[in-house]
């Protein structure tokens, strides 16, 4: 006999973002098991150089189609390449040009997966919900309260860092079936159900770059400007091929050889002098210039869409997969905050996102403007 929940779900249509990967495949399967009317939607977000071996779009679409056929659900396709170029890629290039290090995956979620996708699912496919294969969870409040976004159950795979721009309205319209599972369990389900994606490896790297070498890709769109590498005292110790290829705290790829009168400790990027096109490097992972006591962030997005008006104790991540850092948020205005860490941190990078948590709850975040 059908459960009450199963029967209520059968009136609801869910459009699943099918990427051709295991997480979205299992998401579609689980929603079908829960009784929803499930349809897939495959997005093509990148048009350039599809003839290169790096672009897996054709293979991904074939895998998504095979999974939908196996599950007996329709698959729609949509091309968001123009929206992606205008709203994600041009920002990505502008940030690199300005010497910052952006995170395009966060912008892709904001502008494409939870905006353009949601609008298309609403207007064309008449969706009640959309669903994605992200490792996050959400609450389902019964009494008119705003839903909250929670970290994924699998701490290793939690993707809330990439989704902090979502509003409670977007969270309310989205289901995250695999957020309640550990990754090995997701693969086990895919295998049990005979889904072609069960053993497919997870995609890595920025969506439009894929597996190729980042510097090669970037140089096609932004001309590199070589310059000097200096110590904080102004001593020239090497040359760089372009500031955009380097990020704060970076150790590899500096090609600074052994020098007289210097210790054997490795060199790290401590700063970028944009005016002079100079990279500043220091020796030793514990060098004080590598450490920040806090940061200033702007372009804030709070999941509940309520600005912070007084100091808040919470934790922050300044990059993906980082352990939580205890901190205090101090509001400077509705759209700017100062964040002071309990302990100094390395590699706090302007252009990256600072994302805030209270326990399991993702509060939101913003773009790092400067470090303190």
UniProtKB/Swiss-Prot annotation:
Residues 157-159, 319-320 are annotated as: Interaction with tRNA. The record marks 134, 352 as: Interaction with tRNA. The active site is at residues 108, 207. It comes from the Bacteria. Its main location: cytoplasm. Keywords: ATP-binding, Cytoplasm, Disulfide bond, Nucleotide-binding, RNA-binding, Transferase, tRNA processing, tRNA-binding. ATP binds at residues 17-24, 43, 133. Disulfide bonds join 108-207. It holds the Pfam family tRNA_Me_trans. Residues 103-105 are annotated as: Interaction with target base in tRNA. This is tRNA-specific 2-thiouridylase MnmA. The lineage of its organism: Bacteria, Pseudomonadati, Pseudomonadota, Gammaproteobacteria, Vibrionales.
């Amino acid at each position: 006999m059908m459960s009450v929940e199963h029967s209520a779900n059968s009136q609801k249509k869910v459009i699943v973002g099918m990427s051709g990967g295991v997480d979205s495949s299992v998401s579609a399967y689980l929603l079908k098991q829960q009784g929803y009317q499930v349809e897939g939607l495959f997005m093509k977000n990148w048009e350039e150089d599809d003839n290169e071996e790096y672009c897996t779009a054709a293979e991904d679409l074939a895998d998504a189609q095979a999974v939908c056929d196996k599950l007996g659900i329709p698959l729609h396709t949509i091309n968001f390449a123009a929206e992606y170029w205008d709203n994600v890629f041009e920002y990505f290039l502008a940030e690199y040009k300005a010497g910052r290090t952006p995170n395009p995956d966060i912008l892709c979620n904001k502008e494409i997966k939870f905006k353009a996708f949601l609008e298309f699912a609403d207007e064309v496919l008449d969706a009640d919900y959309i669903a994605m294969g992200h490792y996050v969870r959400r609450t389902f409040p019964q009494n008119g309260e705003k839903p909250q976004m929670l970290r994924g159950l699998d701490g290793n795979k939690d993707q809330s860092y990439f989704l902090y721009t979502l509003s409670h309205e977007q969270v309310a319209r989205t289901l995250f079936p695999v957020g309640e599972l550990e990754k090995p369990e997701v693969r086990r389900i895919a295998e049990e159900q005979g889904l072609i994606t069960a053993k497919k490896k997870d995609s890595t790297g920025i969506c439009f770059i894929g597996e190729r070498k980042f510097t090669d890709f970037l140089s096609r769109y932004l001309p590199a400007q070589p310059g000097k590498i200096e110590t904080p005292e102004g001593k020239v110790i090497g040359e760089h091929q372009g500031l955009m290829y380097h990020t704060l705290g970076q150790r590899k790829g500096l090609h600074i050889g052994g020098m007289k009168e210097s210790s054997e400790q490795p060199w790290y990027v401590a700063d970028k002098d944009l005016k002079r096109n100079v990279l500043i490097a220091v020796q030793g992972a514990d060098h004080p210039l590598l450490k920040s006591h806090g940061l200033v962030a702007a372009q804030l997005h709070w999941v509940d869409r309520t600005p912070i008006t007084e100091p808040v104790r919470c934790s922050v991540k300044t990059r993906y997969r980082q352990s939580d850092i205890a901190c205090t948020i101090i509001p400077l205005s509705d759209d700017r905050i100062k964040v002071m860490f309990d302990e100094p941190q390395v590699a706090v990078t302007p252009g990256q996102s600072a994302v805030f948590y209270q326990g399991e709850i993702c509060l939101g975040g913003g773009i790092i403007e400067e470090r303190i």
